[in-house]
Amino acid sequence: MRKMKKRYPDLHFDFHAHNDYDLAVSNVLAAVLSGVKGLHTTINGLGERAGNAPLASVQAILKDHFHAITRIDESRLNDVSRVVESYSGVTIPANKPIVGESVFTQVAGVHADGDNKNKLYFNDLLPERFGRVREYALGKKFRESQHPQKSGEYGTGTG
């Protein structure tokens, strides 16, 4: 793409990535770095064969790593993804970045404990940003001291 941009500097180039090798988002980012301005993305990565670059993932990376300003309302991405899931009949994998059911669930343990210690394991992917909430689940490393609210909720409390 960089050679094309250099050869035709006044042209507006778009980029359309397929996810056949699970690299659609990476390829979109490479296109951005080469100067492409138009990006083709889809909700939930739906598209031919293995799909296309998912809008939610591309948006998050553009904002967090490129400090790009877009007109995407991130707080609506989850709702839009659920509508598309419903109409398309294609289930969103639970671990799909940004919109998957379990991506903002911390299993009580080391990471959950870090949440209680001034966001020790902080990153920019806060669930509230995407219209979601952080959830906690009990795991084999659960300790009451980490999440006393869960102790009472699950009847494991000592009080």
Task: Show the residue positions of the predicted features.
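Catalytic cores of alpha/beta
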Residues: 21-34
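Alpha-helix-loop-beta-strand connector modules within alpha/beta enzyme cores
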Residues: 1-15, 60-65
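C-terminal helical cap(s) of enzyme catalytic domains, especially alpha/beta-barrels
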Residues: 47-77, 81
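Glycine-rich phosphate-binding active-site loops on the catalytic face of alpha/beta enzymes
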Residues: 36-51
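Conserved, mostly hydrophobic/aromatic
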Residues: 35, 58, 151
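A mid-to-C-terminal "edge-of-domain" accessory segment
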Residues: 67-159
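Structural preference for beta-strand elements that scaffold enzyme active sites
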Residues: 10-16, 38, 135-137
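Active-site beta-loop-alpha junctions enriched in small/polar residues
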Residues: 16-22, 44
